[in-house]
Regions:
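Polyanion-binding surfaces on beta-sheet-dominated domains and ring/shell assemblies
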Residues: 1-378
Length: 378
């Protein structure tokens, strides 16, 4: 049972023959010009539709649907909770209490993911929810000097602090509406990002250490992540505001780097990385939060048999037809046209290229964040 559960988390390996796997790998590993099954460029995402504030009774919500029919809905709810300090913090005195209460805590953000065909405690939803939650609570803003960053000092954890005795608790519920046709991480991360952008909290009317009292008028509610005017968003000044992180799925096939991979592309990938990034409000560019490696499902595929080793083909082929060549990306000897499951690791230069493509000025990461910034959340 445990082996089945572990295998089910490996991005749903499609049933492809060794010949199909070899064809896909050869097409995707062409130097500098990979041919993707759907005709996209290496850095191109699937077309999508996005909308926000679709769920009544939530503080924020969003829906994103890809062109292949997969959709996800995210709802964010917030409630006021009394801050419980540990005995060690209380024993440290007033100064320790102030530090612990104002910096926030990662446990104040809870995330749950529901995927059709998976139990709540299966490896895939648990891994995805914890990975996205860690990037959310791990994005810390240094200082708070300009723009909307005064409210976001300390990142999301600091934003949830009301005073020393009270704080907000966030519940982020993610629902994948259809069976995952590929690894669902990009869809879930983009939808969560958009839902958090649309999340509002009631305006606080109480002051200091008083029990929290809020304004009943929802029109004056404040965004969880402060937003600027449309003029600032279109002129590129929105980068001074803190934004939720996004986690991008990146694969390498040979020396090529491919974003938003499909199910078939993941099946032949040499390496699969989940890269979490956010805006660095001080430097004006992107900041790397975390990198997670995902076990490539290509390791679970069945190898092909060269004609020279096939009993049914003895005498039917020339002895020099199956000559092994060295794969420059993996350093392994392979027979052209014969599929071999990926083994070993990946070159450091390939990993560095994957990170550079995400973080560089005008790169994929900036394009994704700018596209999400343009979605209307009013």
């Amino acid at each position: 049972m445990s082996n089945q559960r572990q295998a089910s988390s490996a991005s749903q390996t499609p049933h492809l023959s060794p010949a199909e796997l070899s064809y896909l790998y050869t097409s995707l590993s062409l130097p500098k010009s990979p041919i993707r099954p759907d005709g996209r460029s290496p850095t191109q995402f699937r077309p999508l539709t996005a909308e926000s504030n679709i769920l009544p009774g939530t503080n924020g919500s969003a829906r994103i649907g890809f062109a292949d029919g997969t959709q996800a809905i995210v709802g964010v709810k917030a409630e006021v909770e009394k801050t419980v300090l540990s005995t060690d913090t209380l024993a440290s005195g007033e100064g320790g209490e102030s530090t612990a209460a104002t910096s926030g805590h990662g446990s104040w953000v809870q995330m749950s993911i529901e995927i059709p065909g998976f139990r709540d405690d299966d490896a895939l939803p648990v891994f995805l929810s914890e990975m996205m939650r860690e990037s959310l609570v791990g994005a810390v803003v240094e200082g708070g000097d300009g723009g909307g960053d005064v409210m976001m000092a300390g990142g999301l954890k600091g934003r949830l602090v009301i005073n020393k005795r009270w704080h907000w608790r966030l519940y982020i519920d993610v629902l994948l509406l259809s069976q995952p046709l590929s690894y669902p991480l990009p869809l879930l991360s983009l939808t969560t990002h958009l839902a958090l952008l649309s999340t509002k909290l009631p305006k606080l009317k109480s002051q200091g250490e008083e029990d929290p009292f809020f304004d009943d008028d929802w029109e004056v509610a404040e965004y969880l992540y402060p937003r600027g005017s449309k003029l600032k968003a279109t002129s590129g000044l929105a980068s001074q505001y803190v934004r939720p992180p996004v986690t991008l799925l990146v694969v390498s096939v040979g020396e090529n780097v491919i974003f938003d991979p499909s199910r078939e592309e993941i099946a032949v990938a040499d390496a699969v990385l989940a890269i979490s990034v956010t805006r660095d409000t001080e430097a004006g560019n992107l900041k790397l939060l975390s990198i997670r490696t995902i076990d490539p499902p290509s390791r679970l595929t069945q190898p092909a048999v060269p004609n020279s080793e096939n009993v049914n083909m003895l005498g039917a082929t020339a002895p020099t037809e199956d000559i092994a060549v060295l794969n420059p990306a993996t350093g392994e000897e392979e027979v052209p046209g014969v599929w071999r499951p990926r083994r070993g690791g990946v070159k450091r230069s390939v990993i560095a290229n994957m990170i550079k493509t995400v973080l560089k000025k005008g790169g994929v990461g900036e394009e994704v964040l700018e596209g999400l910034e343009g979605v209307e959340v009013e």
